[in-house]
């Protein structure tokens, strides 16, 4: 592992996450500024990231109810759901859209870190590469990514 890559190894705690609309220049904070998270880089070249919106409401943990809803959706994709099922869907939608999680190998080259996603909460992230420009200042790591018309900047502090 080269010196550039070694700088990443360890656990980092999210300090700030801002999102800028590239076209308008309008800046906002992800999850209304209520984001927490950690990113871990291992010496054997893996990254694991979890970020979440604080204050998310708890959802049902009744496995039978959850499995019944899943079966209903899979067996009748266009079929109607009753009001209890719709409420449960709403709860899970809100919980999932307030959470980001992925892991996979990473590599560093030319001022960028590449997260090669193998597993993720959101299936569309699997088998993609998330490229971030990076900067180290003291105990801080800033990762910046531009996708379509948005630029995300995440500031992490090395966790002791």
Identify the role of each PLM range.
Residues 1-160:
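Lipid interaction determinants
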């Amino acid at each position: 592992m080269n010196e550039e890559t070694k700088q990443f190894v360890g656990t980092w705690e999210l300090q700030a996450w801002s999102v800028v609309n590239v076209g308008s220049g309008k800046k906002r904070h992800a999850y209304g500024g209520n984001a927490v998270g950690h990113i871990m880089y291992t010496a054997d070249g893996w990254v694991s990231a979890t970020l979440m919106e604080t204050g998310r409401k708890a959802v049902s943990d009744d496995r039978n109810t959850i499995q019944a809803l899943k079966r209903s959706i899979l067996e009748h994709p266009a079929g109607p759901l009753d009001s209890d099922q719709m409420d449960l869907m709403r709860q899970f939608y809100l919980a999932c859209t307030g959470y980001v999680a992925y892991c996979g190998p990473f590599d560093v080259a030319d001022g960028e870190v590449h997260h090669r996603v193998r597993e993720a909460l959101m299936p569309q992230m699997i088998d993609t590469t998330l490229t971030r420009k990076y900067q180290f200042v003291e105990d801080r790591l800033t990762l910046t990514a531009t996708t379509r018309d948005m630029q995300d900047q995440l500031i992490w502090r090395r966790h002791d």
